[in-house]
């Protein structure tokens, strides 16, 4: 795969950096939630951390035959706290990706005819919408001192990061079309 044009390349590198940091942040937040007695919220953080890793991998793979050292600029909320604060940080990060980052990156990649980057950005955008809603629901419970109830499991599509809660995965991913039997269970 040939390296993308410079503006798309920069967007992919920035998105890779942001998703990589989200993966680590959510992994740390999971440990905190576990210690505070919110095992389902911890499971949610771990599942979405995996989804963010999927997004980072997809962006990285679309960089093609790039051979460069680069400084990656990626904004991220910092300052871990208790689980309620961490959920607020997670919601803020997801909403930034939904409302600003991915719509802008999609426009850049579309304007440059970078189809694979557009796909990667769109897949991540759709998954982030679900992540934000799940984090909002979790925060409502945590703010009442309760763990978020999860009926079944949290399922993550290993291709695009789509996130689903239920006893079984969907038969097919509604974002990328991957078979549900390939989903990772949390």
What feature does the model see in each segment?
Residues 1-186:
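Non-heme di-metal
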